Amino acid sequence: MRRREHRHCLRGRAFWGTLLVSVLMVATGTFGLSGCSQGGASSTLQPYALPYDQKALEPFISQKTFEFHYGKHYQGYLDKANELLRGSSLAQLPLEEIMKQTATSPDKVALFNNAAQAWNHEFFWKSLKPGGSKPEGELLKKIQASFGSLDSLKRLLLDASLAQFGSGWAWLVLEGDTLKVVKTGNADNPLLHGQVPLLTIDVWEHAYYLDYQNRRGDYVKAIIDNLLNWDFAAANLPKS
């Protein structure tokens, strides 16, 4: 008899415990069909999956630099953006759209900065390729038409990187039917100025300081001569 009463007591505790957990989940918006939150928009920006190993860019970018750059700085921007997106209708949008929709909102400056920095970094990872590549076909024709030669374009990329005061980015962009080299400060991006980015070089100090200290020019030249992914740049040209 006592065993039966004990079992009834345990069942009763389990029932009330389950009921209490369910009430708390509903109250906090963490309970819903298929595990989905009913408390508002919910999404998580995921890190870009690199197509190469983090040591594959050595000796021009060390594994240690890349691990800090990708795992700390870039991941930090994503984490902060996800934190700021919590409960926002913007959380369901892709990263690029979040960046565009917050670019001119004074009350969303922090979200823009982190989303744009995450987007810029992902574009930078794609702009790099172990061993680099060579521009061909339509891209090479546009380079020659816009700059005269590939060497002239490379010099302009280096000049723009060195001319950027403080943190920022150097870009190869398409504006209308012409290629241009531009620079942007902090989290700014050519997409916000009606231009089509083709590739970029990160000139924030965290991108190179462990390897090159204050020698930004050496870092940029190493990328231009050995790591630029011209295939990626060509793929970003609008299809005619």
Question: Which residues does each predicted region cover?
Answer:
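Feature for soluble, non-membrane regions of globular proteins
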Residues: 36-240
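N-terminal secretory signal peptides that target proteins for export/translocation
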Residues: 1-12
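Mature extracytoplasmic/luminal segments of secretory-pathway proteins
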Residues: 6, 32-33
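Bacterial N-terminal signal peptides
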Residues: 17-32
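Hydrophobic alpha-helical segments, especially transmembrane helices
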Residues: 12-14, 123
